[in-house]
Amino acid sequence: MTETKNEIKLHVLFGALAVGFLMLALFSFSLQMLPVADLAKEFGIPGSVAAVVLNVVEAGGAVTTIVSILTAVGSGGLSLIAAAGKETIRQYLKNEIKKKGRKAVIAW
């Protein structure tokens, strides 16, 4: 089996996925460890407002992660469909050239 430059090795993909999940877990853990009281004292805001701000930041991070995953899957899927379509058209034209001849296919 020949490899092309565009192939992604499965172990590299799973390694990157594992690193991503580890970073997400560490980020979530660090947000939980931030003391709300210190945040409130530093900026002079009530503790309830500080808790809401932290929850919004954490939710924003989750939304960003989900959008990034969907974008990656979508762009990879579209390029795969485009490549399959290109190969299908190429094969169809080769078959038509064999049946009708090159000049007939060009005139068609």
Swiss-Prot record:
Entry annotated with the keyword Glycosyltransferase: no
Where is this chain's protein located in or outside the cell? Secreted
Which InterPro entries does the UniProt record give?
Bacteriocin_AS48, Circ_bacteriocin
The propeptide sits at 1-38
Q: How is it modified after translation?
A: The cross-link permits a high resistance to proteolysis. Is more resistant to specific proteases than to unspecific proteases.
Q: Write the protein's name.
A: Pumilarin
Which is a Gene Ontology cellular component entry for this protein?
extracellular region
* Key word Secreted present: yes
The cross-references to SUPFAM superfamilies, in alphabetical order and at most eight, read: Bacteriocin AS-48 (SSF47869)
Q: Which UniProt keywords apply?
A: Antibiotic, Antimicrobial, Bacteriocin, Secreted
Segment forming the signal sequence = none
Q: What does this protein do?
A: Cyclopeptide antibiotic that inhibits both Gram-positive and Gram-negative bacteria. Shows potent to weak activities against M.flavus (MIC=3 ug/ml), B.cereus (MIC=12 ug/ml), B.pumilus (MIC=12 ug/ml), E.coli (MIC=12 ug/ml), and S.pneumoniae (MIC=47 ug/ml). May act by forming pores.
